[in-house]
Design a protein with these regions (language model features):
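Short glycine/threonine-rich loop-to-helix capping motif typified by GTGT followed
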Residues: 127-137
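Catalytic-core "active-site belt" of small-molecule-metabolizing enzymes
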Residues: 1-94, 99, 108, 135, ...
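Short strand-turn-strand beta-turns centered on an Asx-Gly dipeptide
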Residues: 78-79, 121, 141
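A conserved acidic, glycine/proline-rich C-terminal tail/linker
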Residues: 98-127
Length: 152
Protein backbone atom coordinates (compact mmCIF):
# COMPACT_ATOMS: atom_id res chain seq x y z
CA UNK A 1 0.00 0.00 0.00
CA UNK A 2 2.89 2.36 0.62
CA UNK A 3 3.38 3.19 -3.07
CA UNK A 4 -0.31 3.85 -3.70
CA UNK A 5 -1.78 7.34 -4.03
CA UNK A 6 -4.85 7.85 -1.81
CA UNK A 7 -6.00 4.22 -1.42
CA UNK A 8 -9.66 3.86 -0.42
CA UNK A 9 -12.17 1.10 0.30
CA UNK A 10 -15.69 0.62 -1.07
CA UNK A 11 -18.51 -1.90 -0.51
CA UNK A 12 -20.18 -3.40 -3.56
CA UNK A 13 -22.56 -6.24 -4.28
CA UNK A 14 -21.18 -8.79 -6.71
CA UNK A 15 -23.34 -10.86 -9.03
CA UNK A 16 -22.33 -14.21 -10.51
CA UNK A 17 -23.86 -14.65 -13.95
CA UNK A 18 -25.31 -18.15 -14.28
CA UNK A 19 -26.53 -18.05 -17.88
CA UNK A 20 -25.64 -16.12 -21.02
CA UNK A 21 -27.60 -12.91 -21.54
CA UNK A 22 -28.05 -13.09 -25.29
CA UNK A 23 -30.65 -10.41 -26.00
CA UNK A 24 -32.12 -7.16 -24.65
CA UNK A 25 -35.33 -8.86 -23.51
CA UNK A 26 -33.45 -11.40 -21.38
CA UNK A 27 -31.29 -8.60 -19.97
CA UNK A 28 -34.43 -7.06 -18.43
CA UNK A 29 -35.07 -10.09 -16.18
CA UNK A 30 -32.02 -10.48 -13.91
CA UNK A 31 -33.63 -13.34 -11.96
CA UNK A 32 -33.17 -15.42 -15.12
CA UNK A 33 -29.38 -15.04 -15.18
CA UNK A 34 -28.13 -14.11 -11.69
CA UNK A 35 -26.84 -17.32 -10.12
CA UNK A 36 -25.69 -15.74 -6.84
CA UNK A 37 -24.95 -12.46 -5.10
CA UNK A 38 -22.22 -11.72 -2.56
CA UNK A 39 -20.65 -8.86 -0.59
CA UNK A 40 -17.46 -7.36 -2.03
CA UNK A 41 -14.78 -5.07 -0.56
CA UNK A 42 -12.86 -3.20 -3.25
CA UNK A 43 -9.56 -1.43 -2.59
CA UNK A 44 -9.15 1.42 -5.07
CA UNK A 45 -6.01 3.43 -5.69
CA UNK A 46 -3.19 4.09 -8.10
CA UNK A 47 0.49 4.86 -8.42
CA UNK A 48 -0.29 8.48 -9.38
CA UNK A 49 -3.18 10.98 -9.26
CA UNK A 50 -4.00 10.33 -12.93
CA UNK A 51 -4.13 6.54 -12.61
CA UNK A 52 -6.67 4.83 -10.38
CA UNK A 53 -8.33 1.43 -10.42
CA UNK A 54 -9.01 -1.72 -8.46
CA UNK A 55 -5.97 -2.80 -6.49
CA UNK A 56 -7.62 -5.70 -4.68
CA UNK A 57 -11.06 -7.22 -4.39
CA UNK A 58 -12.21 -9.42 -1.50
CA UNK A 59 -15.32 -11.51 -2.07
CA UNK A 60 -17.63 -12.95 0.58
CA UNK A 61 -19.49 -16.26 0.39
CA UNK A 62 -22.11 -16.37 -2.38
CA UNK A 63 -25.80 -16.39 -1.55
CA UNK A 64 -28.71 -17.39 -3.75
CA UNK A 65 -31.03 -15.12 -1.73
CA UNK A 66 -31.65 -12.66 -4.56
CA UNK A 67 -34.86 -11.40 -2.93
CA UNK A 68 -32.84 -9.41 -0.36
CA UNK A 69 -31.16 -7.18 -2.90
CA UNK A 70 -33.68 -4.34 -3.02
CA UNK A 71 -33.35 -3.72 0.72
CA UNK A 72 -29.66 -4.53 1.13
CA UNK A 73 -28.05 -2.36 3.79
CA UNK A 74 -24.27 -2.15 4.09
CA UNK A 75 -22.05 -0.96 6.90
CA UNK A 76 -18.29 -0.54 6.60
CA UNK A 77 -16.16 -0.83 9.74
CA UNK A 78 -12.55 0.36 9.94
CA UNK A 79 -10.69 -0.97 12.97
CA UNK A 80 -13.99 -1.81 14.71
CA UNK A 81 -15.79 1.51 14.12
CA UNK A 82 -18.55 2.16 11.58
CA UNK A 83 -17.15 4.67 9.06
CA UNK A 84 -19.69 4.40 6.23
CA UNK A 85 -23.12 2.98 5.50
CA UNK A 86 -25.48 2.80 2.57
CA UNK A 87 -28.33 0.85 1.07
CA UNK A 88 -28.82 -0.92 -2.21
CA UNK A 89 -31.88 1.12 -3.11
CA UNK A 90 -29.82 4.33 -3.02
CA UNK A 91 -28.01 3.17 -6.17
CA UNK A 92 -30.88 4.11 -8.51
CA UNK A 93 -33.51 1.62 -7.37
CA UNK A 94 -32.38 -1.92 -6.67
CA UNK A 95 -28.78 -3.08 -7.18
CA UNK A 96 -30.28 -5.29 -9.90
CA UNK A 97 -30.83 -2.15 -12.01
CA UNK A 98 -27.05 -1.94 -12.38
CA UNK A 99 -26.65 -5.45 -13.73
CA UNK A 100 -29.55 -4.87 -16.16
CA UNK A 101 -27.76 -1.76 -17.48
CA UNK A 102 -24.47 -3.66 -17.85
CA UNK A 103 -26.19 -6.58 -19.61
CA UNK A 104 -27.86 -4.19 -22.07
CA UNK A 105 -24.61 -2.31 -22.77
CA UNK A 106 -22.72 -5.56 -23.34
CA UNK A 107 -25.43 -6.77 -25.73
CA UNK A 108 -25.31 -3.48 -27.64
CA UNK A 109 -21.54 -3.92 -27.97
CA UNK A 110 -22.05 -7.52 -29.15
CA UNK A 111 -20.15 -8.80 -26.11
CA UNK A 112 -22.87 -10.50 -24.04
CA UNK A 113 -22.50 -11.45 -20.39
CA UNK A 114 -21.70 -15.15 -20.18
CA UNK A 115 -21.97 -17.82 -17.51
CA UNK A 116 -19.21 -17.26 -14.95
CA UNK A 117 -18.87 -13.50 -15.43
CA UNK A 118 -18.93 -11.38 -12.27
CA UNK A 119 -20.54 -7.94 -12.25
CA UNK A 120 -20.12 -5.41 -9.41
CA UNK A 121 -22.66 -2.76 -8.48
CA UNK A 122 -21.54 0.75 -7.80
CA UNK A 123 -20.27 1.46 -4.30
CA UNK A 124 -23.00 1.42 -1.67
CA UNK A 125 -21.41 4.35 0.20
CA UNK A 126 -18.69 6.99 -0.13
CA UNK A 127 -15.20 5.56 -0.43
CA UNK A 128 -13.16 5.51 2.78
CA UNK A 129 -9.43 6.25 3.08
CA UNK A 130 -7.22 3.26 3.90
CA UNK A 131 -3.87 3.17 5.71
CA UNK A 132 -1.42 0.31 6.27
CA UNK A 133 -2.58 -1.65 9.32
CA UNK A 134 -6.28 -0.86 8.85
CA UNK A 135 -8.75 -3.73 9.17
CA UNK A 136 -11.98 -3.33 7.19
CA UNK A 137 -15.15 -5.38 7.52
CA UNK A 138 -18.29 -4.83 5.51
CA UNK A 139 -21.63 -6.37 6.40
CA UNK A 140 -24.36 -6.49 3.76
CA UNK A 141 -27.73 -7.38 5.26
CA UNK A 142 -28.98 -10.65 3.83
CA UNK A 143 -25.74 -11.43 1.99
CA UNK A 144 -23.09 -11.64 4.70
CA UNK A 145 -19.72 -10.05 5.38
CA UNK A 146 -16.16 -9.89 4.12
CA UNK A 147 -12.94 -8.53 5.69
CA UNK A 148 -9.56 -7.24 4.54
CA UNK A 149 -6.42 -6.07 6.34
CA UNK A 150 -4.27 -3.46 4.64
CA UNK A 151 -0.53 -4.10 4.74
CA UNK A 152 2.48 -2.09 3.61
Amino acid sequence: MGALTAPRVETHIGFLVGAAVVDREKASVPADYIAAAFPVLRLVGGRSESESGSIAIAVGAPSIRRNVLRDSLATLNRNGRVVAAGEGASMRQSPCAGIVAVARMRNAAESALRRGHIVLTGSMHSSVAAQPGDHFRTDVLGLGSVCIRCVE
